[in-house]
Amino acid sequence: MRYCVFDIETNDLYQDVSKLHCLVYYSFDTENDTVASGVLVDYDAIKNFLETQERIGVPLVGHNIIRYDIPVLEKLLGVKWNGKVVDTLAIS
């Protein structure tokens, strides 16, 4: 199983957010027993990362990502996330 746990840091709440400082991720592949991690600050690199995760079908995992992180990424990067999501707020 593959999944990607991530978090973002921004300058404000959704309605006033104008800056994405970084996206931090840990990507796990339990079948191959591998872990990758990184901190992305460049908007193009973040867009490419998200497009890759969606294309290969890796679920994004995080806390409150349905109501904050993903909408902020869509707003600031002009992307639409259509991939799988696991929101730990919803399951807590």
Residue spans of the language-model regions?
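Conserved DEDDh/DEDDy metal-dependent 3′-5′ exonuclease domain
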Residues: R2-V5, C22-S92
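Short acidic, Gly/Ser-rich segments with clustered Asp/Glu that frequently serve as metal-coordination loops
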Residues: I8-Q15, I66
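Short, flexible loop/turn motifs enriched in small residues
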Residues: Q15-C22
